[in-house]
Amino acid sequence: MTAAELKASILDLAIRGKLVAQDPDDEPASELLARIAEEKAELIKEKKIKKSKPLDPIVEDEIPFEIPDEWVWCRLGNVCMSIQYGYNAPAKPEGRIMMVRISDIQNGVVCWDGVPYCEIKESDIPDYLLRPNDILFARTGGTVGKSYIVDVVPHEAIYAGYLIRTRYSADVCAKYFEASGISVGRFRSLLRRKAL
């Protein structure tokens, strides 16, 4: 078995809940999802995020494998506070607000020296401003599903139109998505099926 095959095997066991024994003291996933739904409802009420379309429940045909009883199958939209396409504007060599493009992300890192600027209305900036824990996904072309977890934003920056930003509750660790290999295969197939 190669190192890559071993890594894939360990990841597969982990996402199925078979790598370690389940701790009965861990909070059930259903409780976390309920807290996220409450937080989302409050943000909608405060007009900080927009209400999204209701998501279809997971049906039997969509379940690829069994998971521990404390876990729950859900849609990405159930754990995200928001899912939003990026801002469409031409790149500029100078300006105040940087615009991260998929080509600026290499090996999981933004190459900030090459990130261009863009013109954006002041009133639109808060909707597109990147924050730590956001995850960006490429939504078109040969890089569909390529992802980047925003760790640090050294300059005010938004994200370009060919990217999708997912934003999470503080109760959700974006690093989990990276560890689960969401940018590899799984998310790519979700995007292709438009199952978000």
Regions found by a protein language model. Give the residues of each.
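Phosphate/adenylate-binding "loop-and-lid" substructures adjacent to NTP/NAD/dNTP-binding pockets
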Residues: 26-66
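A short beta-sheet element
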Residues: 101-102, 120-185
